[in-house]
Amino acid sequence: GWASKIGTQLGKMAKVGLKEFVQS
């Protein structure tokens, strides 16, 4: 459903943000 889609998008954004945060 749409809730799982949003959850997946948030998960991807969180992973990308975490990578950028660790690298900086």
UniProtKB/Swiss-Prot annotation:
First-listed, main subcellular location of the protein, grouped into a coarse class: secreted
One BP term from GO: defense response to bacterium
Alphabetical UniProt keywords: Antibiotic, Antimicrobial, Secreted
Recorded GO CC terms: extracellular region
Family: Belongs to the gastrin/cholecystokinin family. Magainin subfamily.
Its job: Has antimicrobial activity against Gram-negative bacterium E.coli ATCC 25922 (MIC=100 uM), Gram-positive bacterium S.auerus ATCC 25923 (MIC=25 uM).
Protein name as annotated: Xenoposin precursor fragment B2
